[in-house]
Each structure stands twice: as C-alpha cells, then as structure tokens.
C-alpha cells in the first residue's frame, strides 16, 4: 500500500483496514519518504490531532530504515528489533520493491533461522 504525503490519517487508516495491512509506504513520486503505521495513527489521536485533516507528512516516520532484497531474515529481524520497528521497507537501490513485517515471521521455525544465521556467519 502506497500513499502520498498529503493523504490524511483517516484515508490511510481506511485503506489499511480495507487491505488488512498494518502500514502504508509514503511516497513522493517513486521516492520513499516515510512509513505510516497503526502506531502512528494511535499517536496522532493521542495528541488530539483530527485524522480527517491531518496529513501523513506530519505524523509518519520520516527516512525509515530499509533493507535490500538480498537481506536475510535474521538481518531483517535484527534491524526491526534494534530500531523498534514492526515494518521495514525493502528497497532495490531507490526503488520500493516490498515490505517485511514482524508478522511475516510468525510461524517461522527457530531452527531454520538458526540454520540461516550459522550459514551467514560462515560466509562472513
């Protein structure tokens, strides 16, 4: 889900609800400028902002941390843990190619992650 920075919190929440996703990538043209999440919506409401006329640009996470398509699951989980994020945009150069969330790792077997970590450490 991508939206422009002028989209409102209400519009973003509606689209996120329709698509059953927890985040929207905020784009200016083809450039990622931020991430808007359900947590950002709660924060905006807690501050007393009106979701009908509050633009995403004023409440989104600017210049979000990103990962590349060749990052490992461990890399993504470590970065989410270190930064306190639940969602990470995936950029190939400057082009948004996807998003990964903590939920994507639910049900992933710990053994498989440990296997990947061991392999990664042997490569490096």
What label would you give each PLM region?
Residues 1, 31-32, 64-65:
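Short active-site oxyanion
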Residues 2-20, 27, 67-84, 91, ...:
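The conserved cystathionine-beta-synthase
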Residues 4, 8, 17, 33, ...:
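Alpha-helix N-cap/loop-to-helix boundary motif
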Residues 8, 24, 48-50, 92-94, ...:
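Residue-level detector of solvent-exposed, low-hydrophobicity positions
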Residues 16-19, 24-40, 80, 88-104:
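A glycine-centered beta-loop-beta connector
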Residues 37-81, 99-124:
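Tandem CBS (Bateman) regulatory domains
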């Amino acid at each position: 889900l991508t939206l422009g920075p002028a989209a409102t919190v209400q519009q973003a929440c509606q689209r996120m609800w329709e698509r059953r996703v927890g985040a929207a990538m905020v784009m200016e043209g083809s450039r990622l400028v931020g991430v808007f999440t359900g947590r950002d919506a709660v924060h905006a409401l807690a501050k007393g902002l009106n979701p009908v006329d509050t633009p995403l640009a004023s409440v989104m996470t600017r210049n979000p941390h990103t990962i590349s398509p060749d990052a490992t699951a461990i890399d993504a989980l470590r970065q989410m843990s270190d930064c306190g994020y639940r969602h990470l945009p995936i950029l190939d150069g400057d082009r948004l190619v996807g998003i990964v969330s903590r939920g994507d790792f639910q049900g992933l077997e710990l053994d498989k992650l440990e296997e990947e970590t061991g392999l990664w450490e042997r490569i490096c």
